[in-house]
Swiss-Prot record:
Catalytic residues of the enzyme: D8 (proton acceptor), D131 (proton donor)
Gene Ontology BP terms: L-histidine biosynthetic process; L-tryptophan biosynthetic process
Taxon lineage: Bacteria, Pseudomonadati, Pseudomonadota, Betaproteobacteria, Burkholderiales
Superkingdom, natural source: Bacteria
EC numbers on record: 5.3.1.16
Coiled coil: none
GO cellular component: cytoplasm
EC primary class: isomerase
Keywords, alphabetical: Amino-acid biosynthesis, Cytoplasm, Histidine biosynthesis, Isomerase
Protein family membership: Belongs to the HisA/HisF family.
Pathway: Amino-acid biosynthesis; L-histidine biosynthesis; L-histidine from 5-phospho-alpha-D-ribose 1-diphosphate: step 4/9
Name the UniProt record assigns to this protein: 1-(5-phosphoribosyl)-5-[(5-phosphoribosylamino)methylideneamino] imidazole-4-carboxamide isomerase
Organism: Ralstonia pickettii (strain 12J)
Record HAMAP family: HisA (MF_01014)
Primary subcellular site in the record, as a coarse category: cytoplasm
C-alpha cells in the first residue's frame, strides 16, 4: 500500500482546504519545495500535487512552485500533478518538466475523447481523478455536480489505457472522518484499473482498513490534512502499511 503525501498549491503556498472550499484554506508552508523534501525524508515514495488555482482556472497557475518541487525531489521519487490540465500541450510540457504522472479530472468527464487521446499520446503517464459526492462525479474544482455515476464512468475508461484512478470522496475531504472504504472498494472491484483512495484519511485504523482491501485493487492512498495536523505520523503509517502488506 502506497501512502502518497499531498501538497496542495494555492497562490504558490502549500495549503489544505476543507471539502474543496477555496475560502477555507489553511496555509501549512510558504515553501512547497521544502515541504516536498520533508515528505521524502519521512519515507514518501511518491508525491501528489494539486494546482488548486489551476483547477478553478482551467489552466496551470502554480508552475513556479511545481517546478521548484521537481527540482528538489523529482529525480528521487515519482511526482504526480492534477489541476488545470485540459489539453495535450499542457500534459506534454509537464511531462517534459519532469512529472511522472498527470491527473486528468474535469476534462476526463466532459471530454472522454481528450482522455483517450492523452492515453494514446502519453501512455503510462495518465491518471484519472474522479471526485464524487454521494456517488455522483463532480467537476470544475468540485464546484459542479455531473449526472454521472462514478462506476459507470470508470468502466468507460477501462480500454483507454489509464494508469490509475484517484477516487476522492468530497464529503470527507479534509474532515478527518475516515476513508469511504465501501465506495472505494466498490469502484476498485468494478474495474481492472488500480484505484488510489483519497479524502478523509485520519488515523492508523484507516491504514488497517485500506490494507485489508488492497487485494481488491486499492493500491494506495492520498494523505492530506491528517499528516499536516499531526493526527497521523506519516513514517509510522507507511511502516504499518508495509508490515500489513508483507503479512
Amino acid at each position: 500500500m502506497l501512502l502518497i503525501p499531498a501538497i496542495d498549491l494555492k497562490d504558490g503556498q502549500c495549503v489544505r482546504l476543507k471539502q474543496g472550499d477555496m475560502d477555507q484554506a489553511t496555509v501549512f508552508s510558504e515553501d512547497p519545495a521544502a515541504m516536498a523534501r520533508h515528505w521524502v525524508e519521512q519515507g514518501a515514495r511518491r508525491l501528489h500535487l494539486v494546482d488548486l488555482n489551476g483547477a478553478f482556472a482551467g489552466k496551470p497557475r502554480n508552475e513556479a512552485a511545481v517546478k521548484a518541487i521537481l527540482a528538489e525531489v523529482g529525480d528521487e521519487i515519482p511526482v504526480q500533478l492534477g489541476g488545470g490540465i485540459r489539453d495535450l500541450g499542457t500534459i506534454e510540457r509537464w511531462l517534459d518538466d519532469g512529472l511522472s504522472y498527470v491527473i486528468i479530472g474535469t476534462a476526463a468527464v466532459k471530454d472522454p475523447g481528450f482522455l483517450r487521446d492523452a492515453c494514446t499520446a502519453f501512455g503510462g503517464h495518465i491518471i484519472v481523478g474522479l471526485d464524487a459526492k454521494d456517488g455522483k462525479v463532480a467537476t470544475d474544482g468540485w464546484s459542479k455536480l455531473s449526472g454521472h455515476e462514478v462506476v459507470d464512468l470508470a468502466k468507460k475508461y477501462e480500454d483507454y489505457g489509464v494508469e490509475g484512478i484517484i477516487y476522492t470522496d468530497i464529503g470527507r475531504d479534509g474532515m478527518l472522518q475516515g476513508i469511504n472504504i465501501d465506495a472505494t472498494v466498490k469502484l476498485a472491484q468494478s474495474v481492472k484499473i488500480p484505484v488510489i483512495a483519497s479524502g478523509g484519511l485520519s488515523n492508523l485504523k484507516d491504514i488497517d482498513h485500506l490494507c485489508a482491501v488492497e487485494e481488491h485493487g486499492v493500491e494506495g492512498v492520498i494523505c492530506g490534512r491528517a499528516i499536516y495536523s499531526g493526527d497521523l505520523n506519516f513514517k509510522e503509517a507507511q511502516a504499518l502499511a508495509d508490515k500489513l502488506g508483507a503479512a
